[in-house]
């Protein structure tokens, strides 16, 4: 299950891996939150996983704990793997707080994706990671495949790796960007105002 609208790479990844991407609705009339009834209606015996993008790209929606809990409940009921794209987790504004869905589902196998590309304004560096948590026993083949891919890589982005510790520790300059007067905050407000004038 993949959100709609989604970041197109998710649909491509599912299809390239031999799956069939089935899209669930994120409803504009409900602050772009996932439509829980639509998710339930799309689950079949072939459904293996659910993708969430939180904060969402392209809508910008940040899912509250109540919505995340409903997704966890569905995943638990149907034994779904959760793939959670959280690359924008540090770009949360207006006093809101990002909650990682993996923290709410220690019994479920979750793959959480993040990185520095968005939060630290270094998209060209291509430095990111995935965290595997929960019940890894159900994903032995998946983990074996990840290890194989990792071992086949000839080299990593060494310059980007050298900035990870500094970027994640100490002063978080991203915090200066997301408050009033900060570049990201003010650009967001400008784009929002301009789009609403159309």
Predicted regions and their residues:
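Conserved core segment of the aminotransferase class I/II
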Residues: 106-185, 189-195
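Conserved PLP-anchoring active-site segment centered on the Schiff-base-forming lysine
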Residues: 1-14
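Helix C-cap/helix->beta junction micro-motif
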Residues: 17, 77-78, 108
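Structural detector of well-ordered beta-strand residues that form the stable sheet scaffold
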Residues: 1, 22, 83, 111-113, ...
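Active-site phosphate-binding strand-loop segment of PLP-dependent enzymes
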Residues: 22, 27-97
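Short strand-turn motif at the edge of the Rossmann-like AdoMet-binding core
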Residues: 5, 86-88, 115-116
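Short, intrinsically disordered, charge-balanced linker/junction segments flanking boundaries
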Residues: 42-44, 69-70, 148, 190-198
